[in-house]
Regions:
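Short, surface-exposed secondary-structure boundary micro-motifs
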Residues: 39, 87-88, 228
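A generic structural signal for residues embedded in beta-strands
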Residues: 36, 84-85, 225
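Short, Lys/Arg- and Gly-enriched loop/turn segments at beta-strand edges
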Residues: 42-51, 89-99, 235
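Ferredoxin-reductase
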Residues: 1-78
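Local cysteine-cluster metal-coordination motifs and their immediate loop/turn environment
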Residues: 112, 188-190, 210-240
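FNR/FR-type flavoprotein reductase catalytic core
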Residues: 68-214
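Iron-sulfur (Fe-S) cluster-binding segments and ferredoxin-like electron-carrier domains
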Residues: 195-196, 200-201, 222-260, 274-276, ...
């Protein structure tokens, strides 16, 4: 059991949970993730470890409420517990050793690029982070990323920072020169757009793929992705890959495989949750892209 020791709402549908997991906190490296199961018989889902506190023995998970399981997790409160947390899994981020790195985060992907930006800054690399959100209330992890270097904020409606997409700010930086590597995490269309943008500049671009995943150890094959025409597995070969080699169209198609079943499960959970005693005070979460 992994008790929840802190909870915070970062945006209308993104929640931060800090849970006890001392063994994972001790050995986790940036870019790695855990497989979480709320309770017996529950769905297993991958979540990136956004931060750790080795002294306290805790890890931080940032969760976007989209389907039944993520809604269930974000409805938990301090004192509740998550039954199973397996990890750390996946390969650590291959960090740029010197120069200028640009970390691009879209939506909840911003929480995934934060530990990368943090590690880069600690290694003396110049870090510029670009954060994207629909509007000001959807921008997350701004303070954390400002502690790592310069930050450019882009909102779709112009309510905060620049009016426009993260790719527009990224293009400006690429045009100015001096960018040695880009790390991009967010919705598949965003990662694809960032990768296509940097291709003519020959700037290495690393993306983190949040594929459908069950065991996280390469046994089920559910997280397979096409990389440079070859099949690889996000759990054991990734989760990070060269964005210029990823077949984003295939990945986007695979992510919709169980959409109908996911929607049915969410509707059933929402109905049951609304009918449960004390549900009137429960937090409501809107749906959004990753």
């Amino acid at each position: 059991m992994h008790p929840i020791v802190a909870k915070a709402q970062l945006s209308p549908n993104v929640t931060r949970l800090v849970i006890e997991a001392p063994r994972i906190a001790e050995i986790r490296q940036p870019g790695q993730f855990v497989i979480v199961r709320r309770g017996p018989g529950g769905e297993r889902i991958p979540l990136t470890i956004a931060d750790v506190d080795k002294a306290a023995g805790t890890i931080t998970l940032v969760i976007q409420a989209i389907g039944k399981t993520t809604h269930e997790l974000t409805s938990l409160n301090v004192g509740d517990a998550i039954t199973d947390v397996a990890g750390p899994l996946g390969n650590p981020t291959k960090l740029l050793e010197a120069g200028h790195a640009v970390c691009v985060g879209g939506g909840v992907g911003t929480a995934v690029v934060y530990p990368i930006a943090q590690a880069l800054a600690r290694n003396g690399v110049k870090v510029t982070s670009i954060i994207g959100g629909r509007s000001k209330e959807w921008v997350i992890c701004e303070d954390e990323l400002r502690a790592c270097g310069d930050v450019i904020i882009c909102t779709d409606d112009g309510s905060y920072g620049r009016h426009g997409f993260v790719t527009e700010a990224l293009k400006d930086l690429c045009d100015a020169g001096g960018v040695d590597e880009v790390y991009a995490v967010g919705p598949v269309p965003m990662m694809r757009a960032c990768s296509e943008l940097t291709r003519p500049y020959a700037i290495k671009t690393t993306v983190s793929l949040n594929s459908i995943m069950i065991d996280g150890t390469g046994m089920c094959g559910g997280c397979r992705v096409a990389i440079d025409g070859k099949t690889e597995y996000a759990c054991v070969d990734g989760p990070e890959f060269d964005g210029h080699k990823v077949d984003f169209r295939q990945m986007a198609d695979r992510l919709t495989t169980y959409r109908e079943f996911e929607q049915t499960a969410l509707e059933r959970w929402t109905t049951a949750h609304a009918a449960a005693p004390g549900a009137a005070g429960a937090t409501s979460h809107a749906e959004a892209d990753r």
